[in-house]
Curated annotation (Swiss-Prot):
The lineage of its organism: Bacteria, Bacillati, Actinomycetota, Actinomycetes, Mycobacteriales. This is Small ribosomal subunit protein uS8. PANTHER family: 40S RIBOSOMAL PROTEIN S15A. One of its GO terms (biological process) is translation. It holds the Pfam family Ribosomal_S8. GO terms for cellular component: ribonucleoprotein complex; ribosome.
């Protein structure tokens, strides 16, 4: 069966693994998932990620990040733009997550950017997800 929303599947896997305090989580890989993982790493939500090449297909593995007391660095993830209801934002109305404490991941003409990067560059696009 084909997957209708691979990004939502990725976010659900990360959320479930984080809630269960797993150290790593694996999923099928794609370019957009690797770009989302890169943003999560840059923003300090995950420790690292690797793309492993297998015989069947590529696998993306994320190393989740926790504090010394095993408190999660990802408090929440939410898919915003869905296949049935796309959400777009202009460069002047880019959303802020928790007053700037979280990150909005936005697909722009210049690739995937955070809300802060998109504001700096003056570009809008499709709001993929919120991370806080």
């Amino acid at each position: 069966m084909t997957m209708t929303d691979p990004i939502a599947d990725m976010l659900s896997r990360v959320r479930n693994a984080s809630n269960a305090h797993h150290d790593t989580v694996s999923m099928p890989s794609s370019k957009i998932k690797a770009n989302i993982a890169e943003i999560l790493k840059q923003e300090g939500y995950i420790a690292n990620y690797t793309v492993e090449d297998a015989k069947v297909g590529k696998t993306l593995s994320l190393e989740l990040k926790y504090s010394n007391t095993r408190e999660r660095s990802i408090a929440g993830l939410r898919r915003v733009s869905k296949p049935g209801l796309r959400v777009y934002a202009k460069s002047t109305n880019l959303p802020q997550v928790l007053g700037g404490l979280g990150v909005a991941i936005i697909s722009t003409s210049q690739g995937l950017l955070t809300d802060r990067q998109a504001t700096e560059k003056g570009v809008g696009g499709e709001v993929l997800a919120y991370v806080w």
